[in-house]
UniProtKB/Swiss-Prot annotation:
Origin species: Haemophilus influenzae (strain ATCC 51907 / DSM 11121 / KW20 / Rd)
Family named by the database record: Belongs to the phosphohexose mutase family.
Name assigned to this protein: Probable phosphomannomutase
SUPFAM superfamilies assigned to the protein according to its UniProt record, in alphabetical order: Phosphoglucomutase, C-terminal domain, Phosphoglucomutase, first 3 domains
One BP term from GO: carbohydrate metabolic process
Pfam families (alphabetical): PGM_PMM_I, PGM_PMM_II, PGM_PMM_III, PGM_PMM_IV
Keywords, comma-separated and alphabetical: Isomerase, Magnesium, Metal-binding, Phosphoprotein
Entry keyword annotation includes Magnesium: yes
């Protein structure tokens, strides 16, 4: 069953009951993106919250998820809800819940998620017509949007004028806020992909509005070639993620891996924060290179479970990222990934490089000299029967390979048995490589994350290719039974 007003009403009713038990004077701020019925679902939520006695604020129009995340702290509300399905297909929609005050404005985690779910089930067992509604909620003006823009613009250290780049909003809500932030920061406006710059919940020009998907940046690349652009930046439809694409020496465009962008941003910010105390964090499946950056600049480093609901809760956080194009560059402002802020810091990095007469390619070379050549890959095995996921994870758990591609496994970690208590398997290799296996949280498949190191980028690519084939060879064995991988 897709998202509908009945489900939204049940969710809002259950969340309202939770908030009333959580805070003596509960309050909530509600946002929505440009997907079909997002505005309807947001108003339903506001009415039910107000009817339940929860003070409700509704953002003034379609806006990015990071603006909602910021509004929770700006108004010091008990909670926040964003109606969005991020980069999912057009027919999807979703309900993203945050807790403010003592929880810092991050996404809900256990046990709050389970407690809220139980209350939603209780509401669903009754008649939603019995839920009181009220129009006694506040429709906000642009004050909080302007405050977000001002705070985000301050991330740029200096103005710049000579950056030639392309931007696509992927039919989402990012462009208006990004454009105003660029103007405030004194950074140049991009060439835009006109067919994708304004919200359209049907996403007519892409198969999936996900900048990671093959072909999603085709129109942006076309504009970049016409404008002889240096690079492309893209937000996903709710603008909480950032993608970057660059041309190679032959003029062929390629997207930078999220680990590459994450380490570029992490290194840039680490140098700015030098002398401070704090933590650089990433999800467990993201690049181990961030820990090397933290070590060089005497910061703590931390690996969390997958998702910004965990990264955002890291104590003393200075910067966080996950390989799926999510970056948290300003933890004092929001405790969730923020594609607008990440774009500003990325552009400031480019500005800083230009000031030194350098390019992104030079920056990549310097990173390799400083920390080594890191590369990442992924193998996904889709299943038709969900039970196959458990069977494969059990086989790997009970019969872990002793070596992969001729390299010994130095350490095997089963996180079901650690304090993480999560279905994640980690294989650390003697040559510094790493394989992580985990079931997807959103799709019927198992994901294998591969990280490799080499003397230089070419050598690292060779090691990764051998690593990839080695993993596939193991999975084809009878013990694991994935002949088609």
């Amino acid at each position: 069953m897709g998202m509908n007003r009945v489900l939204v009403s049940q969710a809002a009713g259950g969340l309202a009951e939770y908030l009333k038990g959580y805070d003596k004077e509960p309050s909530i701020v509600i946002g929505y993106d440009g997907r079909k019925n997002s505005d309807v679902f947001a108003r339903d939520t506001a009415e039910i919250m107000a009817g339940a006695g929860v003070k409700a604020y509704l953002l003034p129009r379609k806006l990015p998820t990071p603006v909602l995340a910021y509004a929770i702290q700006y108004f010091d509300t008990t909670a926040g809800v964003m109606v969005t399905a991020s980069h999912n297909p057009p027919e999807d929609n979703g309900y993203k819940v945050y807790l403010g005050k003592a929880n810092g404005g991050g996404q809900i985690v256990s046990p709050a998620d389970k407690d809220i779910a139980a209350l939603i089930d209780k509401v669903a067992a009754g008649n939603i017509q019995d839920l009181p509604r009220s129009d006694n909620y506040v429709v906000l003006n642009d004050e909080v949007v302007d405050a977000y823009i001002t705070k985000t613009a301050s991330l740029a250290k200096e103005p710049a004028c000579d950056i030639n780049y392309v931007y696509t909003a992927m039919h989402g809500v990012g462009y208006e806020v990004l454009s105003k932030t660029l103007a405030k920061a004194g950074l140049p406006q991009p060439h835009v992909v006109a067919d994708q710059v304004w919200p359209d919940g049907t996403f007519p020009t892409v198969n999936f509005p996900n900048p990671e998907e093959k072909g999603a940046l085709d129109l942006a690349i076309k504009v970049a070639k016409e404008k002889n652009a240096e690079f492309i930046i893209a937000n996903d439809p709710d603008a909480d993620r950032l993608a970057v694409a660059v041309p190679d020496a032959q003029g062929n465009w390629k997207s930078l891996h999220g680990n590459v962008v994450g380490c570029f941003l992490g290194w840039y910010l680490a140098k700015q924060y030098q002398g401070k105390q704090g933590t650089l964090a990433c999800s467990l499946v993201s690049s181990p290179a961030l820990a090397e950056i933290a070590k060089k600049y005497s910061f703590q480093s931390e690996e969390t479970l997958t998702g910004f609901k965990y990264i955002g809760k890291v104590s003393g956080l200075l910067f966080g990222f996950e390989e799926a194009l999510g970056y948290l560059v300003d933890p004092d402002k929001v405790r969730d990934k923020d594609g607008i802020s990440a774009a500003i810091v990325f552009l400031d990095l480019v500005r800083n490089l230009k000031k030194q007469g350098k390019t992104l390619a030079d920056y990549a070379d310097e990173f390799t000299k400083e920390f080594g050549a890191y590369v990442s890959g992924q193998i996904s095995i889709r299943v038709s029967d969900l039970s196959e996921i458990g069977k494969l994870m059990t086989a790997l758990r009970n019969n872990p390979p002793a070596e992969i591609a001729g390299v010994k496994v130095a350490q095997f970690i089963d996180h079901i048995k650690t304090d993480r208590q999560s279905d994640i398997l980690v294989f650390n290799l003697e040559n510094g490589g790493r394989l992580i296996a985990r079931p997807s949280g959103t799709e019927p498949k198992i994901k294998f994350y591969l990280d490799a190191r080499g003397k230089d980028p070419k050598d690292a690519d060779r090691v990764l290719a051998e690593f990839d084939e080695g993993v596939r060879h193991i999975l084809r064995q009878d013990a694991y039974g994935k002949q088609d991988c």
